C-alpha cells in the first residue's frame, strides 16, 4: 500500500533576502500562524540560498497538517534584476515621461534566460518581451 499523502493546510509566499532569513517580521508572523518551526525554516532557507546573497529570493512554503513544511525557491524578481543590470536604485516615478536608465537587448535576454523557468513563456523570445515590458513600465529604455 502506498504511503498516505500529507494534507496541505497552507501555502505561504514570501520574498526574503537570500541567506538572511530570521524570525523577525515578515517571516516569523507568517510562519507562526501556521505553527511551523520558524528557526528550522530559517536555517533551511539560508542554507539553500547562501550562493545567491544580495538578491531577494521569492519562496513558496507548503505547510502540512502535521506542521511539517516544504519550500520551493524561485528566481529573483525581474524588476530587481533589471534594476541591477541598469545600475539604478529604483525605477521612475513617471515611467512613460521620465526615463531613468537604459539596458541593452543582450542584458534583457540574459535576464530572460535566468527567469525562463518562472515565467509564463515557452521560448526565450517571449520571455524577452515580458522582461522588456517590465523594464519599460519601470521607466528603463531597452536599446536594440
UniProtKB/Swiss-Prot annotation:
Q: Does the keyword Nucleotidyltransferase apply?
A: no
Query: Which Gene Ontology cellular component annotation is one that this UniProt entry carries?
Result: cytosolic large ribosomal subunit
Q: How is it modified after translation?
A: One or more lysine residues are methylated.
What SUPFAM superfamilies does the entry give?
A: Ribosomal L11/L12e N-terminal domain, Ribosomal protein L11, C-terminal domain
The biological process GO terms on file are: translation
Q: Which family does it belong to?
A: Belongs to the universal ribosomal protein uL11 family.
Q: What is this protein called?
A: Large ribosomal subunit protein uL11
Provenance organism: Streptomyces avermitilis (strain ATCC 31267 / DSM 46492 / JCM 5070 / NBRC 14893 / NCIMB 12804 / NRRL 8165 / MA-4680)
Gene (name only): rplK
